Amino acid sequence: AAQAEIGVLRTGDIDSRSLRELLTYGLKGFAAYLHHAAELGEESAVLNAYLVRGLVATVDSQVDNTTLTALVLETGAKGLAAMALLDTANTNLYGHPELTQVSIGVGERPGILVSGHDLADLEALLIQSKDAGIDVYTHSEMLPAHGYPGLKKYPHLYGNYGNAWWKQHQEFTSFRGPILFTTNCIVPPPSNAVYANKVFTTGAAGFPGYRHIDPDSDGHKDFSVLIELAKSCQSPEAIEDGTITIGFGHNQASQLAQPILEAIHEG
């Protein structure tokens, strides 16, 4: 009875159910960006209020499909505004992303792999590990970090390791060092995962059995346990080689607009 009352199938009408689920998924991403921006000092009362309004609609049986459709579309617009808010937070702290060559190979030193999209956590780890004799690699959503001037200045931000988030089982095994999740996209590890005791989470991310790094009363996060663990690990196993180009943010793209148009006209 409880499942029928609170589960997804509590909504009998298929269209209404689908709209509520679509709205829920949109609000999840929206909330993640708002939380991340707030952590970096940028908030919007208007966007926060919309998040509450949208969530209320997902559980209000009196909201009709026309209203739900409008809310789904509005969530897209508000999501774009949340992205702009987060972009402001990131660029105010770390500068505008610029064209950057990122290594996808590996070095000889042990490493820490950082996933998610919280740039402040990455910066804190880079500062704490700068003289530790280890390298820091980005994974998945953290790849764009290499384009920010305020982060690429750290020489031990070595490169990017791995591909899509769903390849974690294979790539975390071959990385051989600690992994830090700063936001979501955690794939539950298989029972025999050799890397499970090396995974850490922080912020809103978390998973049963993974050690979590909380901030102290001053908001400082101590990543020394990852750094010390990394020192005892082997260097990453190479799965790729070469470089990739990143940094095509809106500011950089606007600077390249004229050369791009000229190249198009020239064929």
Identify the meaning behind each predicted range.
Residues A1-G267:
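Metallocofactor- and cofactor-centric catalytic cores in central/energy metabolism, strongly enriched
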